[in-house]
């Protein structure tokens, strides 16, 4: 009754790709998975001010490739690339293999569920009224072309004695349509009254080409831009 499956999990292999891309030998899967979780926790803690949206981990033969999706790549890279070099060394030490770090910029953070959730949590921790924070985030997303967005808050909203759940939605968020590109994220706001949980669903349109279309777009985004020929 009223229980909802994780929108990302149900779409894996249909219109969503895995965040960890590798195969493990027999008996090594648990260690690699635990190592992935440790690396993610380390990166999220180290880059908590860099507006990190997603971290993808790939493990080709005897090395690793980590792609960090962020709205503020300058903070991740640091002055003359010093921060990203230090990050690469630390992660390589944790994983025990050479690591290559890619930085991808999120051009529209208002349409990224993880960044929207972080933004709402930041406002709640600064004591902005929760309804105002929700409404502002929803309006920004719709203004930039989202098909629909829903934000749900749970906890002692406004310092109330009894915890409750409130949500706000604009547009359409078709959770039952598997070809729908639903970006889903959760985050926690630590306020003086306690923890407030934030959930965000962003509908970005339908993907008719399936997972192949998603992977083709990812490769296109990662490909280096062609060099422009100078005018004579």
Curated annotation (Swiss-Prot):
<dbReference type="GO" id="GO:0019843">
    <property type="term" value="F:rRNA binding"/>
</dbReference>
<dbReference type="InterPro" id="IPR004044">
    <property type="entry name" value="KH_dom_type_2"/>
</dbReference>
<keyword id="KW-0687">Ribonucleoprotein</keyword>
<dbReference type="InterPro" id="IPR004087">
    <property type="entry name" value="KH_dom"/>
</dbReference>
<dbReference type="Pfam" id="PF00189">
    <property type="entry name" value="Ribosomal_S3_C"/>
</dbReference>
<dbReference type="InterPro" id="IPR018280">
    <property type="entry name" value="Ribosomal_uS3_CS"/>
</dbReference>
<dbReference type="InterPro" id="IPR036419">
    <property type="entry name" value="Ribosomal_S3_C_sf"/>
</dbReference>
<dbReference type="InterPro" id="IPR001351">
    <property type="entry name" value="Ribosomal_uS3_C"/>
</dbReference>
<dbReference type="GO" id="GO:0003735">
    <property type="term" value="F:structural constituent of ribosome"/>
</dbReference>
<keyword id="KW-0699">rRNA-binding</keyword>
<comment type="subunit">
    <text>Part of the 30S ribosomal subunit. Forms a tight complex with proteins S10 and S14.</text>
</comment>
<dbReference type="InterPro" id="IPR009019">
    <property type="entry name" value="KH_sf_prok-type"/>
</dbReference>
<dbReference type="GO" id="GO:0022627">
    <property type="term" value="C:cytosolic small ribosomal subunit"/>
</dbReference>
<protein>
    <recommendedName>
        <fullName>Small ribosomal subunit protein uS3</fullName>
    </recommendedName>
</protein>
<dbReference type="InterPro" id="IPR015946">
    <property type="entry name" value="KH_dom-like_a/b"/>
</dbReference>
<dbReference type="GO" id="GO:0003729">
    <property type="term" value="F:mRNA binding"/>
</dbReference>
<comment type="function">
    <text>Binds the lower part of the 30S subunit head. Binds mRNA in the 70S ribosome, positioning it for translation.</text>
</comment>
<dbReference type="GO" id="GO:0006412">
    <property type="term" value="P:translation"/>
</dbReference>
<dbReference type="Pfam" id="PF07650">
    <property type="entry name" value="KH_2"/>
</dbReference>
<feature type="domain" description="KH type-2">
    <location>
        <begin position="39"/>
        <end position="107"/>
    </location>
</feature>
<dbReference type="InterPro" id="IPR005704">
    <property type="entry name" value="Ribosomal_uS3_bac-typ"/>
</dbReference>
<comment type="similarity">
    <text>Belongs to the universal ribosomal protein uS3 family.</text>
</comment>
<keyword id="KW-0689">Ribosomal protein</keyword>
<keyword id="KW-0694">RNA-binding</keyword>
């Amino acid at each position: 009754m009223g229980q909802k499956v994780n929108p990302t999990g149900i779409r894996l292999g249909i219109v969503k790709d895995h965040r960890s891309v590798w195969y493990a030998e027999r008996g090594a899967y648990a260690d690699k998975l635990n190592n992935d979780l440790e690396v993610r926790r380390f990166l999220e803690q180290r880059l908590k001010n860099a507006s990190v949206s997603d971290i993808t981990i790939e493990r080709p033969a005897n090395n690793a490739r980590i792609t960090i999706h962020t709205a503020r790549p300058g903070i991740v890279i640091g002055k003359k690339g010093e921060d990203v070099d230090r990050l690469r060394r630390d992660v390589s030490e944790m994983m025990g293999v050479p690591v290559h770090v890619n930085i991808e910029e999120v051009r529209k953070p208002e349409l990224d569920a993880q960044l929207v959730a972080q933004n709402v949590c930041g406002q709640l921790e600064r004591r902005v009224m929760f309804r105002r924070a929700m409404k502002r985030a929803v309006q920004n997303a719709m203004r930039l072309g989202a098909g629909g967005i829903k934000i749900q808050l749970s906890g002692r909203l406004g310092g109330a004695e009894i915890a409750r759940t409130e949500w706000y939605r604009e547009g359409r968020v078709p959770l039952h349509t598997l070809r729908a590109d639903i970006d889903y994220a959760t985050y926690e706001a630590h306020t003086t009254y306690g923890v407030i949980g934030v959930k965000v669903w962003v509908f970005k349109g339908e993907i008719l080409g399936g997972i192949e279309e998603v992977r083709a777009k990812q490769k296109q985004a990662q490909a280096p831009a062609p060099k422009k020929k100078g005018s004579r």
